[in-house]
Swiss-Prot record:
Protein name (database record): Probable GTP 3',8-cyclase
Keyword Membrane: no
Organism: Archaeoglobus fulgidus (strain ATCC 49558 / DSM 4304 / JCM 9628 / NBRC 100126 / VC-16)
Residues at which [4Fe-4S] cluster 2 binds: 245, 248, 262
Highest classification ranks of the organism: Archaea, Methanobacteriati, Methanobacteriota, Archaeoglobi, Archaeoglobales
Record has GTP-binding as a keyword: yes
């Protein structure tokens, strides 16, 4: 079991398999990477994943950049050890093309970033992306069983803060008898230069909390899922949130193969050249030293 000095058990691993992306979203935090080096190899991804699995990690999430830009991604997924869940975060542009193959290789489900259904607004946010490709990708993911699809909507003040109802209606259109899609509403981390887009999503959450017919509190950051007549919706508030940090159960691996204990900190731990027991010891020690960014 991987546990830090605050009693937080690491059960989830996020591996950024590439720094490359086919969109240019103006707010992107690049998984906390500032100057990534050489891209991690497929063999090293599998080796690190196996080390974490042997130390008790149960779930793996593949991130980027845009993971679908790696041509060897199907082989990577095929060679991963067996986790309770292997999921992937994607912008969805290439998802329609690869969804079925990735499902056959062992991918469990996907998170798809979609901040708006408005074509012009989407093009502006993403630096030229086509929203219909994302919609097609979500439809394909639901069709082949990469479910539940979580649609990640980052709320941007003055841009899309009035579009939650529309995105939830779109999300719920896939739920015919069972939950195939969930809307995940995310509060912006106001990194320098983006403060003007920050929007406190508490008021939106209060609205859906009032109409919820059922609630489920997830272990991940103690987040609440609301089951409403309009669909299933969840809220992610990372800023100034001690509960978010005190229930953090994840570790990150950067696209150049370093350990990153916290998204909001610049610290990375080099594990180059470490294998077997030496790699395991490095992981254990890195986890042990983790600290919450926001403390009570």
């Amino acid at each position: 079991m991987l546990k830090d000095e605050y009693g937080r058990v690491v059960t989830n691993l996020r591996i950024a398999v590439t720094k490359k992306c086919n969109l240019r979203c103006f707010y992107c935090h690049k998984e906390g990477e500032s100057n990534p080096g050489e891209e991690i190899s497929a063999e090293r991804i599998v080796e690190i994943a196996r080390a974490f699995k042997e130390l008790g990690v149960r779930k793996l999430k593949i991130t980027g950049g845009e993971p679908l830009l790696r041509k060897d991604l199907p082989d990577i997924i095929l060679n991963l050890p067996e986790f309770e869940e292997i999921s992937m975060t994607t912008n969805g542009i290439l998802l329609e093309k690869y969804a079925e193959e990735l499902r056959e290789c062992g991918l469990s489900r996907v998170n798809v970033s979609l901040d708006t259904l408005d074509a012009e607004k989407y093009r502006w946010i993403t630096g030229g992306g086509e929203v219909q490709k994302v919609v097609n990708g979500i439809e394909k993911a639901c069709e082949v069983g990469l479910t539940p699809v979580k649609i990640n909507m980052l709320v941007l003040g003055g841009v899309n803060d009035n579009e939650v109802d529309e995105l939830l209606e779109f999300t719920n259109s896939f739920n015919r008898g069972n939950t195939k899609a969930i809307l995940q509403v995310i509060e912006l981390v106001p990194f320098p230069g983006f403060e003007k887009y920050f929007f406190d999503i508490s008021t939106i959450e209060e609205k859906y909390a009032r109409m919820a017919t059922q609630r489920r509190v997830r272990a991940m950051h103690r987040r609440t899922q609301y089951f409403t007549p309009k669909g299933v919706i969840e809220f992610v508030k990372p800023m100034d949130n001690t509960a978010f940090c005190m229930h953090c159960n994840r570790m990150r691996v950067t696209s150049d193969g370093k350990l990153k204990p916290c998204l909001l900190r610049n610290e990375t731990i080099t594990i180059d050249g470490k294998h077997g027991e030496e790699l395991a010891r490095a992981i254990i020690e890195t986890v042990r030293k983790r600290e919450p960014y926001f403390k009570g």
